[in-house]
Amino acid sequence: CIILTLCLALPTATNYPLLKLLADCNTSTHHPPPPTPAPRKTCGHRLQSECVGQTQVEIQCGPWTVKAGQSFVDLHTTTLQGVPVTVTIRL
C-alpha cells in the first residue's frame, strides 16, 4: 500500500498539512456510506480499456477517505455542513 508506506516513512508529516492527513491512516475493511455520485471520470487520452486493469487502494485517514491508483490520489470528506469535498492529485 503506497499511502500506508508514506504514513510510516514520514515521521515529520505533522509539519505539512496534506501529509498530516496521512498520520492516522488505517486500511479500510469496510467502506463509509457512498457519497453522492460524482461525474464519471475518464482516463484522459488513454483508452477506457487501459484503465480497467489499474489497481486502486482505498484507505481511511481520519475524516478523509483516500483512494490511490497508479496515476492519481483522491482525498474525499464531507464538511460539518454536509458539503462533500474532493481533492484529486494527478501524478
UniProtKB/Swiss-Prot annotation:
Keywords for the protein's UniProt record, in alphabetical order: Early protein
Pfam families: Pap_E4 (PF02711)
InterPro entries, per database record: Papilloma_E4
Family: Belongs to the papillomaviridae E4 protein family.
Protein name: Probable protein E4
Gene name of the encoded protein: E4
